Design a protein with these regions (language model features):
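A structure-centric signal for secondary-structure junctions around beta-strands
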Residues: 37, 57-58, 149, 218
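Short, surface-exposed glycine/acidic/tryptophan-bearing loops
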Residues: 51-72
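Extracytoplasmic and endomembrane cell-envelope/extracellular-matrix remodeling and assembly machinery
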Residues: 1-26, 30-31, 70, 75-102, ...
Length: 242
């Protein structure tokens, strides 16, 4: 983070985190994992819900398809739950908790989140050390993973000591607030935008998991907070929406 590019990336991510910080903190608490794990979302995606890596890892927490399905992140032609900040955060928290239960150490759990549990298992078996720093010294983990855990620790220290790192003046984006309403029929997002007098871009931002400009029947659509009653009433007046 000492380079201009690295610092700009960190600051933009911390600013964007304001939209999701309270949500992530709540889910991590509910799943019983340390709050510091929020910094994995910064390292993985910079808190971008629609981030996609060169290896097709997707979403804020960068799940590949198989791992996502393992933790209940469903995909269809209409939506991809890996792009849903709340669902993906819960899946990531549960995955990290499982990794901790497997390795008995949060540093190893974080390393396994990056390179997969098999990579950490092989490193432990090869050296006889179930300790990240011993594995680090022996250079038996992938280079990316050897750097990954220190990056998470560095971000944790920097955020907790924001003044010491000239980060105290970052103005975070306001949190995204919303209600949810189940759609009884295929519903165009532009219609919801018209009903709520909000831009379509906001409706899409509230629903990053949607791959199209419509929500399928049965989908729990996120709508601007406080709009549930009049959105429901307006949809009831539209033929075919019941």
């Amino acid at each position: 983070f000492s380079t201009d590019k690295g610092r700009k990336t960190l600051i933009s991510g911390l600013r964007r985190a304001g939209k999701y910080r309270s949500l992530i903190a709540r889910v991590l608490d509910e799943e019983g994992v340390p709050q510091e794990l929020i910094h994995l979302a910064q390292a993985e995606s910079g808190f971008l819900p629609r981030a996609v890596s060169r290896k097709a890892a997707t979403g804020m927490w960068q799940f590949v398809q198989a791992r996502g399905r393992e933790y209940g992140l469903m995909q269809s032609s209409y939506h991809d739950d890996r792009l849903d900040p709340e669902k993906a955060t819960r899946a990531a928290a549960r995955h990290l908790r499982d990794l901790y239960n497997e390795f008995g150490d949060w540093y190893l759990a974080i390393a396994a989140y990056n390179c997969g549990p098999g990579g950490v298992e092989r490193a432990v078996q090869r050296t006889g050390y179930a300790d990240f720093w011993e594995l680090y010294k022996r250079n038996v983990l992938p280079k990316e993973t050897r750097n990954y855990v220190p990056i998470i620790l560095a971000m944790t220290i920097m955020v907790k000591n924001a003044r010491d790192y000239d980060l105290e003046d970052i103005d975070p984006d306001p949190p995204l607030e919303y209600d949810s309403l189940e759609m009884s029929a295929v519903t165009n997002l532009a219609l919801i935008a018209d009903i709520t007098d909000q831009p379509v871009s906001l409706i899409r931002e509230l629903n990053p998991a949607l791959l199209k400009t419509v929500a399928p029947a049965g989908y729990e659509l996120r709508i601007p907070k406080g709009s549930t009653s009049f959105v429901a009433a307006a949809l009831d007046l539209i033929p075919g929406s019941k």
